[in-house]
């Protein structure tokens, strides 16, 4: 009984995390124009390090542990605008030709099997 409840809880937690991620991507319009994607990435770069520092300070206060000071993350310039839409276009292009390629490959496979059985 406990195993079933535990597996159900794991499923619900994983589903909630996945649903939250999908909602966040949709709400922030991350699959839309690259301007919004780049702005969201920049916003995350500004917000996440202070949040991690604040959380580590909270953990130190609650547990009494001393967490060593981490070095500052390097500043990396990656022009996401140049590659984001290209990646989306490539994936969508591959998905659009998948049915015809599957038909073509299955036809070739069928011809191969027919040739081998003769």
Swiss-Prot record:
Subcellular localization(s) per the UniProt record: Mitochondrion inner membrane
The keyword Membrane is annotated on this UniProt entry: yes
Assigned GO CC terms: MICOS complex; mitochondrial crista junction; mitochondrial inner membrane; nucleoplasm
Primary localization class, coarse: mitochondrion
Superkingdom of origin organism: Eukaryota
Topological category with respect to the lipid bilayer: Single-pass membrane protein
Sequence ranges on the Mitochondrial matrix membrane side: 1-7
Residue intervals passing through the bilayer: 8-26
Entry keyword Cytoplasm: no
InterPro entries reported for this sequence: Mic13
GO biological process, one term: cristae formation
Side Mitochondrial intermembrane, residues: 27-118
Keywords: Membrane, Mitochondrion, Mitochondrion inner membrane, Transmembrane, Transmembrane helix
PANTHER family documented for this protein: MICOS COMPLEX SUBUNIT MIC13 (PTHR31816:SF3)
Membership in a protein family: Belongs to the MICOS complex subunit Mic13 family.
Quaternary structure, from the entry: Component of the mitochondrial contact site and cristae organizing system (MICOS) complex, composed of at least MICOS10/MIC10, CHCHD3/MIC19, CHCHD6/MIC25, APOO/MIC26, MICOS13/MIC13, APOOL/MIC27 and IMMT/MIC60. The complex associates with mitochondrial outer membrane proteins SAMM50, MTX1 and MTX2, and with HSPA9.
Its job: Component of the MICOS complex, a large protein complex of the mitochondrial inner membrane that plays crucial roles in the maintenance of crista junctions, inner membrane architecture, and formation of contact sites to the outer membrane. Constituent of mature MICOS complex, it is required for the formation of cristae junction (CJ) and maintenance of cristae morphology. Required for the incorporation of MICOS10/MIC10 into the MICOS complex.
Name assigned to this protein: MICOS complex subunit MIC13
